[in-house]
Amino acid sequence: LSVSAADKIHKTMDYLLANNKITWEGSLKATYYKWLHPDVLEYDNKEMWDIVPTIYSCFQFDTAISAKALSATKPHSVMDLSAANSLLRLQPDNADETPINRYIRYKNNHEAWVQDTIDFGLNDEERGVLWEYLSDAYGLADSQEKVMRLSMDKRVAGYTLKESNRLRKSIAKKSVKLQEEAKQQFFEYGRKIGTREIFLDYIWNVVFAASMG
C-alpha cells in the first residue's frame, strides 16, 4: 500500500474509535487485526457493502469516473468489486457501449444479457458455455484468464495453453495486424472443430472485443 492509503486506514480507525464503532486493542496493529484485517471482515454483511459506494476516495476507485462507476455498480461481493475495477480499465476503441456500462446494464437486469445473446442468434448450448465462464461478471470477460479459458474450450476453439496465451497478448496490443492475425486463427480453429460461425463472431466481437487494446 502507498503511504497515502495507509494514512487513510489510520484516519478511518480514528473515526471508528471516536464513534465507538470499534474498541482500542492496545496498539494500532492489534486494533487493525482485530477489526479491519481482510481475514476478519464479514463479507456477507449487507450493511458493509451498502456503504461502499458512499466511501470517499475508495481504494482503486478514487477518481471521479471510477467513483461514479462504483456508485452505479453497487458491489455486494469481492467478485463484484474486482469486476468493476477490472472493467473500468478496459476502454476499447469504437465501442458503442463501454464494458463497465454493459456490466452495469446486465447487473441491474440479469435478463438483458440472456436477451442480447438470444437476439444475436446463440442457441441454448452456446449460451450455456458462456454462462460457465462469464456468469460471475454478468456476461463480461473481466480478466485475461477468461479470454484464455474460453479460447481453450473444445466447444469454442480448442486452443492449447500456449496458443491461448499468445491470443491474450495479441488482442491486448494496439496492433491491428496482430489482432487480425489472432482473429483469423481463432475463427479457423473454431471452424475446424465445428463451432458455429455466429458463436465465434459473438465471442470475438462482443466478449473479446472489450479487452482489445
Give residue ranges: language-model regions.
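Mg2+-dependent phosphoryl-transfer active-site scaffold
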Residues: 1-213
